[in-house]
Amino acid sequence: MMHYDVAVIGGGIAGYSAALRALQAGKKVVLINQGQSALHFSSGSIDVLGRLPDGSVVNQPFDALSALQQQVPEHPYSKVGRKNSEKGLMWFKRTLDSAHVPLHHEPDGANHWRITPLGTLKNTWLSQPFVYPYRGNADFSRIVIVAIDGYRDFQPAMLRDNLAQRPELANTPMLTVNVSIPGFEGFRRNPNELRSIDIARLLRQESAWNALCDQLMRVARPDDLVIMPAIMGNGDGLHLMTKLQQVTQLRFHEVPTMPPSLLGIRIEEALHRSFIQGGGVQLKGDKVIGGDFAGSRLTAIHTQNLRDFPISAEHYVMATGSYFSQGLQASQHAIQEPTFALDVQQNPDRAQWRHAQFIAAQSHPFMTFGVITDANLHPSRQGKTIDNLWCCGAMLSGYDPVFEGCGGGVAIATAYHAVEQILATYAQTKQPEVLL
């Protein structure tokens, strides 16, 4: 049997955050994840809280946590608390900074808007260096939207039309420019087959790189905001964006595209690299299929690939995600947590799972369904609390990450809080030194 201090189940942003925090504290950590995480579909920014459950727009996310606690006492943020939530987010920022993916937030702690691929504005709190933090006061003379010939996952006309409907941008000139990058012929079989990964590989060629720079400098000025799809990477995306800015002297705003999202991949690669370089053990491509319980403790877990070799740990952190990652499974009449059959908060009346209108002004109830935890994020199984198991991230009940704009923030805050409690147990059991 393989034994660890901490076993983390799930390799999304919550799982990696928990594993890294434990590893940084000197613990022996194993991370088990089934495959690619939802970070490959993400914006690459970290949303803390964009809207309260009653629909009120949030400007200062941490200040709003007291109002959130009054509205939803069982919200994950309500269990973690403001102080620990802030500590967790700042820890994550420092961790990514040290992994060469610096994230920025506004000096006053407020949310900023990021311009989305659809030309809408979305509240967020931490963004990557080439995501423009819009606060409603444009400090650019024009918006230049870059379309790349043959690239099908970016719709510049839609972005421009939606952005032009913003009252504060009504008098800001917007233009769309097409750029061609030589060398596409070897990557595609039809005119619109290219993906962001294809372009990223192509731009490693000097001729393609120089062609892109030359065309951008001809159509844009230093006082413009140049919006372009995230096509730089993978592995060296931020380095290439910095180089592009230095060569062209332009101000860029990267927008994520259809999957794979290079902005999200940057974060996952940074987390993975930090975990492996720090000495963590990762079982990638494996899946936890069950566990052994003794009283109120989880004593061992079993994986699909290591059926005859159970994994044991002093503490377990579970971050298997929601429906998308199969951390929760929905049948016609019930929601289940499939790995350990943990207790799930849900409404037994299927008709109450959603509103009559798909696009509604409020959260659909099923989005708040998830694993029930106590104030310390311990789940229960058949009504019995599991004392050495913590749950975090999208599998938790009591919140809607989409409606509230808080998915990344909750994932990081709950993972950090779970591991801080684990570390506290070691501090409590540490024997005092005897001075002779």
Swiss-Prot record:
Q: Which cofactor does it need?
A: FMN
Q: Which Pfam families match?
A: FAD_binding_2
One GO cellular component from the entry? glycerol-3-phosphate dehydrogenase (FAD) complex
Q: Which UniProt keywords apply?
A: Flavoprotein, FMN, Oxidoreductase
- What metabolic or biological pathway is this protein involved in? Polyol metabolism; glycerol degradation via glycerol kinase pathway; glycerone phosphate from sn-glycerol 3-phosphate (anaerobic route): step 1/1
Q: What is this protein called?
A: Anaerobic glycerol-3-phosphate dehydrogenase subunit B
Question: What family does the database annotate?
Answer: Belongs to the anaerobic G-3-P dehydrogenase subunit B family.
Q: How does it assemble?
A: Composed of a catalytic GlpA/B dimer and of membrane bound GlpC.
EC number in record:
1.1.5.3
The reactions it catalyses are: a quinone + sn-glycerol 3-phosphate = dihydroxyacetone phosphate + a quinol
Q: What does this protein do?
A: Conversion of glycerol 3-phosphate to dihydroxyacetone. Uses fumarate or nitrate as electron acceptor.
Q: Does the keyword rRNA processing apply?
A: no
**Which GO MF terms are attached to this record?**
glycerol-3-phosphate dehydrogenase (quinone) activity
Q: Please list the GO biological process terms of this entry.
A: glycerol catabolic process
Q: What class of enzyme is it?
A: oxidoreductase
